[in-house]
C-alpha cells in the first residue's frame, strides 16, 4: 500500500481562482480560515436553524434544530481530530505522515465538514427526501427503464421514455431517470456547495462532506469492497465532472472516500444518539427515569463495571445524588454526554489510527464506530431506544406524515412547470412571463433567482441540435424544482403550502 502523506490529501487549491505558488504553514492555514468564513456566513448554514432534527415545526427553542445539532457535531469532530493529532504526536508520527505543518488545516477541515454535513437536507428531513423521491418515481418509473419490451415503459415524460432503435439515447434516459428519483441530502449538499452557491471551497474541504461515493444514477449491485461507502447516493449526474476533478485533486480511487470524512461521520454518530434522547425528554415523550429503564432493559445482561454501568449507570447515579440541587434532567444528560464522549472519542480516534492505511486510501469499508466492540454496542443501544420509543411516537409520526404531505403537495403545485413543452418552457425562461401560461408564469416567478440562474447557465451550454438536448434539458428542469423545494426551511415550506392551497392561516 502507498505511503501515508497527508500533504497529498489536504489540497488547499480551489476550483476557481485558486491560490498559486508554494505556501508557508501560516498561508495555508489562512486559506482554510477563508473556507471557514465562507461556510459559516453562508445562507445554507443559516437555514439549518429552521430545519428539522427530529421534531418538525418545533417552537420550543430548547429542542434541537439541524443547526444546533450541526454545531454539536462540529465540537465532537474537533475533539476527535485533536485526539488523533495528539496521539500521533506522542508516537512521533506527525512528520512521518506529513501532518507536522498541517494540524490546523486538519482540524479546520473536520470542523467545517461537521458543520456542513446536513446542509443538503430538505424540509422535514428523511420524510422530505422520501416525498421527493416517491413523487418523481410515480411519474418517471425508473424501474421500467430496464423493462422489455419497451412498450411496457410507464414514464409520463415523452423525452425520457425509452424508444426503439435509440439505444445510446436510451442509456442516457435510464441514467437521468435513476438520478432524478434518488434525491439525497448528502448529494444535494455537494450540489449546494459547488453548483448553486458557488462557494469555491478548497478541494480538501469539499472532500470532507463526500460521505457516500455511489453516484445517484447507479444501477445494479455495488462491489462488496465498497458496499458501506456506496450504500447511498453521494452525488448527482449534474456534478459528475466536478467529482471526477475532485477525485483527481485528492488522489482518490473510484468510489473511495476522503480520509477526514470518517471523523465527521463518527462525530455525527456520537452527537445525534444522545441528543435525540434528550430532545425526547424535553418534549415529554418520556421522563429521565423512564429513559433510564428503557436503556437498562435494552442493554440486556448486566455486569459490574460494564460499559453500560460506567456510562449510563454512572450518569443515573450522579443525577440522582444531585448534590448541586440542579434539574435531574439536566444533570443526567450532562453526565451521560460527558461519559459517552470520554469513552467514544478516544476509541474513535484510535480506530482511525489503527486503520489509517485503509482510511488514507479511502477504502475502509465501515464506520469508525461500527464494529463488534462494546462502544459500538453503546451507540446501537441509544439508536434502538430512540427508534422504539421516540421515532414511533404518535406525535412524531403525525408530524412526519404532515411533512410528507407538504412536500408532495408543493411538487403537485409546481408540476405545471414540468408539464410544459421544451419550447414553451424555454420561451418562459427567456421572457419570464407568457400570457398564454398565466399559472406557469406565476410559478416560475416564485422560484429562487439563484436556482433559475443555475438552470439557465447549464442548459445554455448544451448543444441544441443534439439528440440528447431534450433529455438533459428536462433533467435540469427537474433539478431546478428539486433545488427550490429542498432549499426551503420547514416553516417556509409549511407556510408556502398553506398559502398556495388557500388554507386559512
Curated annotation (Swiss-Prot):
<dbReference type="Pfam" id="PF01966">
    <property type="entry name" value="HD"/>
</dbReference>
<dbReference type="InterPro" id="IPR006674">
    <property type="entry name" value="HD_domain"/>
</dbReference>
<comment type="subunit">
    <text>Homotetramer.</text>
</comment>
<dbReference type="GO" id="GO:0006203">
    <property type="term" value="P:dGTP catabolic process"/>
</dbReference>
<keyword id="KW-0378">Hydrolase</keyword>
<protein>
    <recommendedName>
        <fullName>Deoxyguanosinetriphosphate triphosphohydrolase</fullName>
        <ecNumber>3.1.5.1</ecNumber>
    </recommendedName>
</protein>
<keyword id="KW-0460">Magnesium</keyword>
<comment type="function">
    <text>dGTPase preferentially hydrolyzes dGTP over the other canonical NTPs.</text>
</comment>
<dbReference type="InterPro" id="IPR023293">
    <property type="entry name" value="dGTP_triP_hydro_central_sf"/>
</dbReference>
<dbReference type="GO" id="GO:0000287">
    <property type="term" value="F:magnesium ion binding"/>
</dbReference>
<dbReference type="InterPro" id="IPR050135">
    <property type="entry name" value="dGTPase-like"/>
</dbReference>
<dbReference type="InterPro" id="IPR020779">
    <property type="entry name" value="dNTPase_1"/>
</dbReference>
<comment type="similarity">
    <text>Belongs to the dGTPase family. Type 1 subfamily.</text>
</comment>
<feature type="domain" description="HD">
    <location>
        <begin position="66"/>
        <end position="273"/>
    </location>
</feature>
<dbReference type="GO" id="GO:0008832">
    <property type="term" value="F:dGTPase activity"/>
</dbReference>
<dbReference type="InterPro" id="IPR006261">
    <property type="entry name" value="dGTPase"/>
</dbReference>
<dbReference type="InterPro" id="IPR003607">
    <property type="entry name" value="HD/PDEase_dom"/>
</dbReference>
